[in-house]
């Protein structure tokens, strides 16, 4: 389902989201889109599990540009365990989980994935 920047920002602040978006910088040999598990929910990210399992760390500084003017969002990428900028020109919300639901889903479906499985997930 296509989602606007403001709606996605609201979802990210409250949930963990699975999204697919158009890459800002195309890469040779990989699809034009990128799939991501991401979250901006600071309660989840700053929790013990967020810091130990997801390796969350605060950014320390804000972006050097106005993300709204660029139609982008900066979010925590759960697989890459780092902050990422996503292009909101074409974003699909595939799934979302509340913080309470997320850890069960993560432990059952995502934690067992190998590095190759995670790359396959991100490129589909």
Question: PLM features: residue spans?
Answer:
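A short, Trp-centered hydrophobic/proline-enriched beta-strand micro-motif
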Residues: 13-25
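Mixed-charge, Lys/Arg-rich low-complexity intrinsically disordered regions
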Residues: 1-8
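Structured surface patches comprising rigid loops and adjacent beta-strands/short helices at the edges
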Residues: 41-46, 81-102
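Short, flexible beta-strand-to-coil junctions
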Residues: 22-28, 76-81
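C-terminal low-complexity, charged extensions that often adopt amphipathic alpha-helices
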Residues: 89, 101-123
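Acidic, aromatic-enriched beta-alpha/helix-loop junctions
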Residues: 40-82
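Extracellular/luminal recognition modules and glycoprotein regions
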Residues: 35-38
